[in-house]
Amino acid sequence: MAQIRIHEINTRIENEVEVSKFLQEEGVLYEKWNISKLPTHLKENYSLTDENKAEILAVFSKEIADVSSRRGYKAHDVISLSNSTPNLDELLINFQKEHHHTDDEVRFIVSGHGIFAIEGKDGTFFDVELEPGDLISVPENARHYFTLQDDRQVVAIRIFVTTEGWVPIY
């Protein structure tokens, strides 16, 4: 279950109902997908082949199709980041720069953890700490950045309206 940390007042929201309500009020789509259906050989696997990535997409194909039909998403892929990723530190530096996109930024966490820091409607940033099974859609034009948690590893399904609209604007 995702958790929220509000930056300026360092308050945490950990209750599932309160997390969902907070994100809904901020215009952030949040869903919990059934991660238990992921085959064992893909759990906590950060060295994925193209076949592994295709299998992950197949496992969650119904959920991807459902959210895509509701929200107008047209493309998806799988990304894996870990300490074995070449230039991980350089990638994280870029990810941690505040930016926005002209399309939603959608991520479903398959393994590992990630944090989206999002500027709220009142101008205060809040972290959404994500774990396996969490899907988030950062709204278009919302200022945000992404980083990894202390384990420095994540596998995520990325879902796009268009890949062109997903280019970061700093």
UniProtKB/Swiss-Prot annotation:
Pathway: Amino-acid biosynthesis; L-methionine biosynthesis via salvage pathway; L-methionine from S-methyl-5-thio-alpha-D-ribose 1-phosphate: step 5/6
Binding site for Ni(2+): 99, 101, 105, 144
Catalytic reactions on record: 1,2-dihydroxy-5-(methylsulfanyl)pent-1-en-3-one + O2 = 3-(methylsulfanyl)propanoate + CO + formate + 2 H(+); 1,2-dihydroxy-5-(methylsulfanyl)pent-1-en-3-one + O2 = 4-methylsulfanyl-2-oxobutanoate + formate + 2 H(+)
Top-level taxonomic group: Bacteria
Enzyme Commission code(s) on record: 1.13.11.54, 1.13.11.53
Residues annotated as binding Fe(2+): 99, 101, 105, 144
Positions marked as site (Important to generate the dianion): 107
GO MF term set: acireductone dioxygenase (Ni2+-requiring) activity; acireductone dioxygenase [iron(II)-requiring] activity; iron ion binding; nickel cation binding
Gene3D superfamilies, sorted: Jelly Rolls (2.60.120.10)
GO biological process annotation, one example: L-methionine salvage from S-adenosylmethionine
Site (May play a role in transmitting local conformational changes): 104
Cofactor(s) listed: Fe(2+); Ni(2+)
Residue numbers marked as site, May play a role in metal incorporation in vivo: 98
InterPro entries, per the entry: ARD (IPR004313), ARD_bac (IPR023956), RmlC-like_jellyroll (IPR014710), RmlC_Cupin_sf (IPR011051)
Keyword vocabulary terms for this entry: Amino-acid biosynthesis, Dioxygenase, Iron, Metal-binding, Methionine biosynthesis, Nickel, Oxidoreductase
Entry's cofactor comment: Binds 1 Fe(2+) cation per monomer. Binds 1 nickel ion per monomer.
PANTHER family reported for this sequence: ACIREDUCTONE DIOXYGENASE (PTHR23418:SF0)
Record family assignment: Belongs to the acireductone dioxygenase (ARD) family.
Description of how the protein assembles with itself and partners: Monomer.
Protein's job: Catalyzes 2 different reactions between oxygen and the acireductone 1,2-dihydroxy-3-keto-5-methylthiopentene (DHK-MTPene) depending upon the metal bound in the active site. Fe-containing acireductone dioxygenase (Fe-ARD) produces formate and 2-keto-4-methylthiobutyrate (KMTB), the alpha-ketoacid precursor of methionine in the methionine recycle pathway. Ni-containing acireductone dioxygenase (Ni-ARD) produces methylthiopropionate, carbon monoxide and formate, and does not lie on the methionine recycle pathway.
Stored HAMAP family: Salvage_MtnD
Name listed for the protein in its UniProt record: Acireductone dioxygenase
Organism: Bacillus cereus (strain ATCC 10987 / NRS 248)
Gene encoding the protein: mtnD
